[in-house]
Amino acid sequence: MANLIIDIGNTALKASWCDGITLGKTYRYQGERMLDFILSMVEKEKPEILVLSSVRNFTSANIQRLSEVCDKLVVVDEQLLDLYRLPSWLTPDRAASVIAARYLFKGKGCTIFDLGTTL
């Protein structure tokens, strides 16, 4: 069973199915009905783990709905920042980058360039 990672930024929703650290098919959506788009992605295949990083306000009802379509929902929020001892001023997308880099480069120094839509 695959996992689904989703990043909702200021400009668009980006998502990818993945198996471990290997990314699969990726998606980009720029409409207003983000929850509906996510639900359409999981109609045919239920993700084991769904990871959500969002700089937009995602209601608790939407979070609850997402928890119903996967085995485990991980939301990059203040609790996750505390768990990884990250500063509270980090946005969820940047925090996800730091957590991933720590996993991929365990015990090594690492510099992360995360420019979002700056370029």
Q: Would you name each region that the model predicts?
A:
Residues 1-24, 101, 107-119:
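Gly/Thr-rich phosphate-binding beta-strand-loop-beta motif of the actin/hexokinase/Hsp70
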Residues 16-32, 83-87:
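Glycine-rich phosphate-binding "P-loop"
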Residues 31-34, 56-58:
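Short beta->alpha connector loops
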Residues 35-44:
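Short amphipathic alpha-helix with an adjacent loop that forms part of the alpha/beta core around
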Residues 44-92:
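Short beta-strand-loop/turn "lid" adjacent to the catalytic site in phosphate-handling enzymes
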Residues 82-112:
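Conserved phosphate-binding catalytic cores of ATP/NTP-utilizing and phosphoryl-transfer enzymes
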